[in-house]
């Protein structure tokens, strides 16, 4: 009897096709942004080096700061996803990413750049696990496999977007406005 109630509850959480597509696109857009902000500092390293007088170790710390923020949230993330659900968790986390992007664009020192990168890392740390948790709850088995693989592809596209497109936009916009644009992109995924 108890297992039937559990199965009934799981089946009642399944989404219809249209809602599934909307949910996937929202999560995929967030994961795209996550991968983009993860890799963008490598593309911007010459400009950041020039503007802040950074050395190779500083660039390494900027990259590491992102991963430190990301890693710091991983243990509690699983509990929060189970307790509050993927939607609520990713929205809270993405708010941190928006703040981090804005702080990065306004940074005046290496320390403020590093703090902003840690905040961004924390903010996007749920961008893969929240969707995978949601898909497991809301999609049937065949849709789950497709959604998971498409999510990983979306992340790869985000990494690609951090290279040539960013290099093309740099002379037009500069790196600070690009982080404002990233903040707006992340806000848009939250909508």
Language-model features, listed with the residues they occupy:
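Paired small-residue
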Residues: 100, 111-119
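Cytosolic juxtamembrane N-terminal segment immediately preceding the first transmembrane helix
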Residues: 2-30, 34-35
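Conserved MFS/SLC helix-loop-helix module at the cytosolic interface between two early adjacent transmembrane helices
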Residues: 72-108
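Helix-loop-helix hairpin linking two adjacent transmembrane segments in secondary transporters
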Residues: 151-191
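Residue-level signature of mid-helix packing/kink "hotspots" within the transmembrane helices
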Residues: 39, 67-75, 159-160
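Cytoplasmic helix-loop-helix junction between adjacent transmembrane helices
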Residues: 116-154
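Extracytoplasmic
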Residues: 22-54
